[in-house]
Amino acid sequence: LGEKPFTCMECSKSFSQKSNLQTHYKIHTGEKPFTCMECGRTFSQKSTLLSHYKMHTGERPFSCSECGKSFSHKNKLTLHQKIHTGEKPYACTECGKRFPEKSKLKIHWKIHTREKPFSCTECGKKFSRESNLYFHQKMH
C-alpha cells in the first residue's frame, strides 16, 4: 500500500505506476502534445488540458462556505480557505516569510536565487514565472 517504485531520474519524484512516470517526464523534456482548441496553449498532460478547459467554460462547481467565492477546482477552494483560517504552514528558510501554499513559497524562493528558468523563444527575455512568460509571449 502506497508503494511508489517508479522514480524520475530528473527530480526524484516517485510514482506507483510506470505510465504516471512517463507522463510526468514530459515536464522535463518540454514535450507538450496536448493543445487547447480555444486559445492554442499547449500542455504536457491531457489532465492539465482538461482542467484548463474550465477556464474557457467558466465552470466553477466548488464554493467557499465562508464567503461564497467559487472555484473550478477543489484544490483551489482548499487553498482559498486558508485565507479565512490564516494558515501559512510554509516558511522561507532564507527570510522567514510564510505562505499558505507550497507553490507560492517556491515562487518566492526565486527572489533569493534570482532564478529565471523561463525564456521567450522570440526575444530571449527570461522570467522567474511561467505565467509571466505566457503573458509576455502574447505581446509578440
Swiss-Prot record:
Belongs to the krueppel C2H2-type zinc-finger protein family. The lineage of its organism: Eukaryota, Metazoa, Chordata, Craniata, Vertebrata. It comes from Xenopus laevis (African clawed frog). Keywords: DNA-binding, Metal-binding, Nucleus, Repeat, Transcription, Transcription regulation, Zinc, Zinc-finger. It is found in: Nucleus. The keyword Transcription applies. May be involved in transcriptional regulation. This is Gastrula zinc finger protein XlCGF49.1. GO terms for molecular function: DNA-binding transcription factor activity, RNA polymerase II-specific; RNA polymerase II cis-regulatory region sequence-specific DNA binding; zinc ion binding. One of its GO terms (cellular component) is nucleus. A zinc finger (C2H2-type) spans 6-28, 34-56, 62-84, 90-112, 118-140.
